[in-house]
């Protein structure tokens, strides 16, 4: 057995964490021979609920779980971390301006970034899920200057998986038969789900998605809006936000960081844009296609970008630039 790793999940009393913690504990994220010390952080009013989650994790009798620690204190939660999954954030309440939401979250993610800087290992991998995820991730990274910015990523894998499954449903294949869809930009309704480079396996052969579907108007219209608005559609139907699918996407995202991406496949994640070759301004936390090896991601280079894509990629970059500017105004005063 290897040495145990310390993994933190914040917002640990919430819906997404409830669906995620079992996957982490049973070895399907970090492997079946990797012992784990699982740290659960939430705000003080949630400690009663968190206690129940702690009891359930103990009752799962998972052989890889060496210890489970539930706390409301950052200095305990962030100590010596190998991985931090930042799920907790201030949810948007009815009638709340996006600006107010940003302000509340800048405070949270500045504090958590500072705690990472102070207590965590410098090699820690940080995955931000709490919305607005891209800007929250950038805020945390800026607040932890001695941790490499490449170690910070945010979740756009849920959008990526949604795009894959929409294509699969349309073609009557399984999601596994579809690969190399891309989510560009912000995890918001300006994101751009791009299948210009995606492939689908049909009768044992790999075919481009555009060629396989022969339905450009659907691919440039309804497909994009369905993926962009899927989160809202789930809330409308379920009266709660996506939890099971979000937890599955987080597990996919972390597993790929840990073990690398399969040969010939790339995935989408929000990462720092510095040095990209797609004309996205530097110093944004933007979703790109990446490949991962030895726990290090690299941009997928050299994909041709048509005018339709360019416009959509620029639009979401513009939104992220505005979010960043608003957040940084608050950051200096937070």
From Swiss-Prot:
Is the Oxidoreductase keyword given for this protein? yes
Q: Which residues form a coiled coil?
A: none
Annotated EC? 1.1.1.37, 1.1.1.96
Could you describe the post-translational modifications of this protein?
ISGylated.
**Matches recorded under Gene3D superfamilies:** Lactate dehydrogenase/glycoside hydrolase, family 4, C-terminal, NAD(P)-binding Rossmann-like Domain
SUPFAM superfamilies named in the record: LDH C-terminal domain-like, NAD(P)-binding Rossmann-fold domains
Carrying N-acetylserine, the residues are: 2
Amino-acid positions noted as binding substrate in the UniProt annotation, renumbered to this chain: 92, 98, 131, 162
According to the UniProt entry, its GO molecular function terms are: hydroxyphenylpyruvate reductase activity; L-malate dehydrogenase (NAD+) activity
User: Where in the cell does this protein reside?
Assistant: Cytoplasm, Cytosol
Task: List keywords of the entry alphabetically.
Answer: Acetylation, Cytoplasm, Methylation, NAD, Oxidoreductase, Phosphoprotein, Tricarboxylic acid cycle, Ubl conjugation
What is an example of a Pfam family matching this protein? Ldh_1_C
InterPro entries documented for this protein: L-lactate/malate_DH, Lactate/malate_DH_C, Lactate/malate_DH_N, Lactate_DH/Glyco_Ohase_4_C, Malate_DH_AS, Malate_DH_NAD-dep_euk, Malate_DH_type2, NAD(P)-bd_dom_sf
Which residues does the record list as Omega-N-methylarginine (modified residue)? 230
Task: Mark the residues carrying the PTM Phosphoserine.
Answer: 217, 241, 309, 332-333
Top EC category: oxidoreductase
The record lists the catalysed reaction(s) as:
(S)-malate + NAD(+) = oxaloacetate + NADH + H(+); (2R)-2-hydroxy-3-(4-hydroxyphenyl)propanoate + NAD(+) = 3-(4-hydroxyphenyl)pyruvate + NADH + H(+); (S)-2-hydroxyglutarate + NAD(+) = 2-oxoglutarate + NADH + H(+)
Positions bound to NAD(+): 11-17, 42, 105, 112, 129-131
A GO cellular component term found in this entry reads: cytosol
According to the UniProt record, list the residues that bear N6-succinyllysine.
110, 214, 298, 318
Its quaternary organisation is: Homodimer.
So what family is this one in? Answer: Belongs to the LDH/MDH superfamily. MDH type 2 family.
Protein name in UniProt: Malate dehydrogenase, cytoplasmic
């Amino acid at each position: 057995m290897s040495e145990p790793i310390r993994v933190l999940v914040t917002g640990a009393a919430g819906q997404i964490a409830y669906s995620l913690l079992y996957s982490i504990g049973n070895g399907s994220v970090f492997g079946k021979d990797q012992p784990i010390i699982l740290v659960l952080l939430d705000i003080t009013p949630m400690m009663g609920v968190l206690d129940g989650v702690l009891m359930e994790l103990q009752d799962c009798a998972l052989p890889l779980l060496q210890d489970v620690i539930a706390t409301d204190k950052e200095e305990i939660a962030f100590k010596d971390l190998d991985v931090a999954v930042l799920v907790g954030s201030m949810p948007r309440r009815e009638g709340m301006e996006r600006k107010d939401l940003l302000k509340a979250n800048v405070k949270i993610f500045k504090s958590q970034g500072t705690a990472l800087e102070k207590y965590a290992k410098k090699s820690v991998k940080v995955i931000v899920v709490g919305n607005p995820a891209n800007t929250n991730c950038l805020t945390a990274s800026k607040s932890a200057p001695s941790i490499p910015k490449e170690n910070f990523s945010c979740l756009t894998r849920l959008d990526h998986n949604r795009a894959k499954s929409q294509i699969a449903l349309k073609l009557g294949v399984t999601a596994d038969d579809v690969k190399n869809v891309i989510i560009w930009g912000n995890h918001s309704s300006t994101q751009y789900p791009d299948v210009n480079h995606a492939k689908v396996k049909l009768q044992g052969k790999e075919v481009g998605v555009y060629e396989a579907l022969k339905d450009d108007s659907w691919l440039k219209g309804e497909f994009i809006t369905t993926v962009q608005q899927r989160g809202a559609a789930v809330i409308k139907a379920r009266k709660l936000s996506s939890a099971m699918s979000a937890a599955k996407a987080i597990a996919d995202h972390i597993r790929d960081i840990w073990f690398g991406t399969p040969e010939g496949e790339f995935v989408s994640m929000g990462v720092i844009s510095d040095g990209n070759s797609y004309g996205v301004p530097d110093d944004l936390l933007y979703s790109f296609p990446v490949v991962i090896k030895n726990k290090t991601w690299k941009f997928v280079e050299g994909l041709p970008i048509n005018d339709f894509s360019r416009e959509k990629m620029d639009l979401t970059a513009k939104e992220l630039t505005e979010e960043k500017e608003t957040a940084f105004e608050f950051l200096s005063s937070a």
